[in-house]
Amino acid sequence: MKIQKTLFLSFFSLFIISCGANKIVYPTQIEYTANPQLILDEFIAYIELQGYKIINANDTRMTLRNQNGFFTAEYLETEWFNSGVYDEPTGKEFIIKQKVWIILDSNQISVKSVFGYLDGEEMIVFDSAPDELYRVVNALPEGLKQMVSSKAL
C-alpha cells in the first residue's frame, strides 16, 4: 500500500511539473511542391495579414553555403513584433522575429522564430517559452504549414 502511494505521488508530481514546464521552440520544416514564387507571394500576404512587417519583401533571393556546397533560397525576415505577453520576473514584453527560408534546390521551407525582450540596450533571447508565449510564437509557423497543406502548395 505504501509503495503504491509513493508511486502514485511520484507520477502525479512528474505530471504537474511537466505541465508547468516551458516548451522548446524548434524551427519548423515544411515540404512544398508548387512554384517557389507562388509560395513566396502567398507567404508575404499571409505574414503581413498576421500583423508582422516584412523587412525585405522586394529583395528576397540569396545564395547560401553549407557543407555540401551552395544553394539558393528565397528569404523573408520580419521586424520585431510585440507579442502582448510579458515576462513575469521582469515585466518586459516579449518581442518576436520570424525568419523564413524557401529553399529552391530541395523544395523545403524552414521557419525560425527568434523571441525575447529588450533589457536596456541588450536583447535577451530565449529557446523555450511558457504556454501562452509558445502559442503566439508558433502561430505563424503553424499557419504557414497549414496553408501549404490546404492549398497544395
For every predicted segment, state its role.
Residues 20-153:
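Ser/Thr-rich, low-complexity intrinsically disordered terminal regions
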